[in-house]
Design a protein with these regions (language model features):
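ABC-type ATPase nucleotide-binding domains, specifically the catalytic core motifs of the NBD
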Residues: 50, 65-66, 85, 89-106, ...
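ABC ATPase NBD coupling module
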Residues: 61-78, 97, 102, 216-220
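Conserved ABC ATPase "signature" region
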Residues: 103-121, 172-173
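Conserved ABC ATPase signature
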Residues: 125-129, 133
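A short, proline-enriched helix->beta-strand linker immediately N-terminal to the Walker B motif
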Residues: 144-148
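Catalytic Walker B motif of ABC-type/P-loop ATPase nucleotide-binding domains
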Residues: 150-154
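Conserved beta-strand-loop-alpha-helix hinge in the C-terminal portion
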Residues: 206-229
C-alpha cells in the first residue's frame, strides 16, 4: 500500500496537501489545472522536493531514503535519454552508472527491450528512433529498475493520440504483469479514462483522495467541471 500521511508541500506561496492511500497494483491518474501541483507531488514522492508528513510504502517510511534508493521509477515528459549513448547503454545506466555490465546484465537489457517491442535495437542511438520508440526505450529503462512504484509525469504528452494510446496500453500491460503501482499525471481526461481505475483531482491546494475514474467524470465536482469547461 502507498500511503500519503498528512503530506504537505510548501514552496513560497505554493502549498499542497495530500492525505490518502492506494492499494498496491492500482493505476491512478492525477488531473487538475496547470500549476495545481500534480508534478510537484510526484517529485516529492520521488524525494526531489521536501515535504512535511510521511510517505509510506508497505508501512515503511520513505522519508529517510535518498531518491535513488526509493522503491520507485519515474518517467518524465522529455524522457531523459542521453543522445550520445546507445539505447542499451541508456538502459545500462540504471544497472551500473559506470556501465560496468556483465553478460547477465546485457541479457536483461535485451529481454527488457523485447518486452517493449524494441528487440534488436539496443545498438541504436536515441536520434535514430521515432518518438514512440523513444517512449518505449524510456519505459524499458524504468522497467529494468524493477521498482514496485512507477511515476509518470506526462511522458507521452508530445505523442499523437493513437501512439499515446498505444503507449498507455503498454504501460498498463506491463504494470499488470509486474504488479506495479502507477501514478500518472495527465491533463487529458481521455487518458485518465483509458488508463486509470482511480483518479486524484488536484486543485486549490489539495490533492483529493482517489475516486473511481468513471464515477468522478460522470459526476464531476465544481472544480473539475470548471477544468473541463462544463
Amino acid at each position: 500500500m502507498l500511503r500519503l500521511d498528512r503530506v504537505e508541500i510548501s514552496q513560497g506561496t505554493f502549498r499542497l496537501t495530500a492525505d490518502w492511500q492506494v492499494s498496491a497494483g492500482e493505476k491512478v491518474a492525477m488531473i487538475g489545472p496547470s500549476g495545481a501541483g500534480q508534478s510537484t507531488l510526484l517529485m516529492a514522492l520521488a524525494g526531489f522536493v521536501p515535504y512535511a508528513g510521511k510517505v509510506l510504502w508497505q508501512g515503511g517510511d520513505l522519508g529517510p531514503m535518498p531518491p535513488g534508493e526509493r522503491p520507485l521509477s519515474i518517467l518524465f515528459q522529455d524522457q531523459n535519454l542521453f543522445p550520445h549513448l546507445t539505447v542499451a547503454q541508456n538502459l545500462g545506466l540504471g544497472i551500473s552508472p559506470r556501465l560496468r555490465l556483465g553478460a547477465e546484465d546485457h541479457a536483461r537489457i535485451e529481454t527488457t527491450l523485447q518486452r517493449v517491442g524494441l528487440g534488436g535495437m539496443g545498438a541504436r542511438k536515441p536520434g535514430q528512433l521515432s518518438g514512440g520508440q523513444i517512449g518505449r526505450a524510456a519505459l524499458a529503462r524504468a522497467l529494468l529498475r524493477a521498482r514496485p512504484i512507477l511515476l509518470l509525469d506526462e511522458p507521452f504528452a508530445a505523442l499523437g493520440p493513437a501512439l499515446k494510446a498505444e503507449m498507455l496500453d503498454l504501460v498498463a500491460e506491463t504494470a499488470a504483469e509486474t504488479g506495479a503501482t502507477v501514478l500518472m499525471v495527465t491533463h487529458d481526461p481521455a487518458d485518465a479514462r483509458r488508463f486509470a481505475g482511480l483518479t486524484v483531482l488536484v486543485e486549490a491546494g489539495i490533492a483529493h483522495a482517489p475516486q473511481p475514474t468513471a464515477d468522478l467524470f460522470a459526476n464531476p465536482p465544481p472544480a473539475l467541471q470548471a477544468y473541463l469547461g462544463q
